[in-house]
Curated annotation (Swiss-Prot):
Cellular localization per UniProt: Cytoplasm
GO biological process: thiamine diphosphate biosynthetic process
Membership in a protein family: Belongs to the ThiG family.
Organism listed in the record: Nitrosomonas europaea (strain ATCC 19718 / CIP 103999 / KCTC 2705 / NBRC 14298)
Originating gene: thiG
Gene3D superfamilies recorded: Aldolase class I
Protein name: Thiazole synthase
UniProt keyword annotations, A-Z: Cytoplasm, Schiff base, Thiamine biosynthesis, Transferase
Length: 268
């Protein structure tokens, strides 16, 4: 398959994986390996990547030489907090510019605050960040974020951590059809079929965390998600047959059969 290209860099995997909620760093690494993910997102406010020298460092098991780390602003509720967090991430990662922006608007649902998200995106793009941005499934907001200069649009499929799957495929389809940057479904994926559906719609990738980390067997689920993303992408590229009513046809030709009778309803 053709690679996923984000901010000028190519990736063979279209599955992006988060690092939260695992039992320990060893399980995190095992899940990453099983998923085949190359872009790994890290919550800067919750995960140590050098801020706390006396604590285990995620970079020891997921070194930047092997993976593209995607610092994110999970837990930020203002544009100012989000910008400050990503500036810190850039310092900790020696000038790393590819980041995931999310500014939340509600602590219970974790819906994005799109006004604050747009505000933060403008600042970050101006400062040279390559911004992958978590947003609602509103096509107008998605276009505004692309116009600002975001490197990828990441609409939610449903609430973060809900596992409810894709609730509004029509809006996602509009975003995909109109976007000229990668569209990556972020939030709400619960199982492999959700990931496959997102890819069949034409999404360029899928980002997930809870669906893998909270599975009964996270490593096995990571492997399942890898296959689902690949299968969904191949199905999208292959092009599904059209849906039809009253035009059913057998998969094997009926002409030339030695025996058989015509169903009486065929002449009615």
């Amino acid at each position: 398959m053709e690679p996923l290209v984000i901010a000028g860099k190519s990736y063979s995997s279209r599955l992006l994986l988060g690092t939260g909620k695992y039992r320990d760093f060893a399980e995190t690494r095992a899940a990453v390996d099983a998923s085949g993910a190359q872009i790994i997102t890290v919550a800067i406010r919750r995960t140590n990547i050098g801020q706390n020298p006396d604590e285990p460092n995620l970079l020891d098991i997921l070194p930047p030489s092997q993976f593209t780390l995607l610092p994110n602003t999970a837990g930020c509720y203002t544009a100012e907090d989000a910008v400050r967090t990503l500036r810190l991430a850039r310092e900790l990662l020696d000038g790393h510019a590819l980041v995931k922006l999310e500014v939340l608007g509600d602590q219970k649902t974790l819906f994005p605050d799109v006004v604050a998200t747009i505000e933060a995106a403008k600042i970050l793009v101006k400062e040279g960040f390559q911004v992958m941005v978590y947003t609602s499934d509103d096509p107008i907001v998605a276009r505004q974020l692309e116009d600002i200069g975001c490197a990828a649009i990441m609409p939610l499929a449903s609430l973060i951590g809900s596992g409810m799957g894709i609730l509004n495929p029509w809006n996602l389809q509009i975003i995909i059809d109109k976007a000229t940057v990668p569209v990556i479904v972020d939030a709400g994926v619960g199982t492999a079929s959700d990931a496959a559906i997102a890819m069949e719609l034409g999404c360029d990738g899928v980002l997930m965390n809870t669906a893998v980390a909270s599975a009964r067997n996270p490593i096995l689920m990571a492997s399942a998600m890898r296959k689902a993303v690949e299968a969904g992408r191949e199905a999208y590229l292959a092009g599904r047959m059209p849906r039809k009513i009253y035009q059913a046809s057998p998969s094997s030709p009926a002409e030339g059969m030695f025996t058989g009778t015509q169903h009486p309803a065929a002449n009615s």
